[in-house]
Amino acid sequence: MSRIGKKPVDLPAGVSASVSGQTIEIKGPKGTRAFKATDDVTLTVEDNVVTVTPRGKSKRARQQWGMSRTMVANLVTGVSEGFKKELEIQGVGYRAAMTGNTLKLNLGLSHDVDYTPPAGVTVTAPKQTEIVVEGIDEQLVGQVAANIRQWRKPEPYKGKGIRYKGEFVFRKEGKKK
């Protein structure tokens, strides 16, 4: 039995769901998202509650049961509240600024890095050393944050680079004389 799959997904006020075949469409104040489940599970919507049930007792059906329930829960969270990743920049001269829709990063390279986020994701730089990535698709928000972090990962000696807010960077001791 899947402990996650057994839990029903409650729809908050202002969020509606409709099922057609194996596809569930969730509409909310921030937008609309859809998810196509595999044939191993059944999706039902009753009284503002989405339930996912397996169609058999196979291992794959049980795996898809929990995963499908989590995907539906993430869709509901995305269209009602949205997802947010915060990044910090540490290092002398490292900074970020928004120019129109493009994020301009000065990271100690010989050139500035210009990053244009994909559709559905909003990137802002409230301070020179902070970057906020927001959107309704959790996977896309995480991927955009990872792509930005990829330009200058935190290094272990001085801790310079782009890191997630609250991320711990293991520090190493330098060379000894």
Curated annotation (Swiss-Prot):
Gene Ontology terms, MF aspect: rRNA binding; structural constituent of ribosome
Keywords: Ribonucleoprotein, Ribosomal protein, RNA-binding, rRNA-binding
Gene3D superfamilies with a match to the protein in the record: Ribosomal protein L6, alpha-beta domain
Pfam families: Ribosomal_L6
Cellular component annotations (GO), alphabetically ordered: cytosolic large ribosomal subunit
Keyword Ribonucleoprotein applies: yes
Swiss-Prot/TrEMBL GO biological process terms: cytoplasmic translation
Keyword rRNA-binding: yes
InterPro entries: Ribosomal_uL6-like, Ribosomal_uL6-like_a/b-dom_sf, Ribosomal_uL6_a/b-dom, Ribosomal_uL6_bac-type, Ribosomal_uL6_CS
Family membership: Belongs to the universal ribosomal protein uL6 family.
Functional description taken from the UniProt entry: This protein binds to the 23S rRNA, and is important in its secondary structure. It is located near the subunit interface in the base of the L7/L12 stalk, and near the tRNA binding site of the peptidyltransferase center.
PANTHER family: 60S/50S RIBOSOMAL PROTEIN L6/L9, LARGE RIBOSOMAL SUBUNIT PROTEIN UL6M
Subunit record text: Part of the 50S ribosomal subunit.
Protein name (database record): Large ribosomal subunit protein uL6
Classification of source organism: Bacteria, Pseudomonadati, Pseudomonadota, Alphaproteobacteria, Rhodobacterales
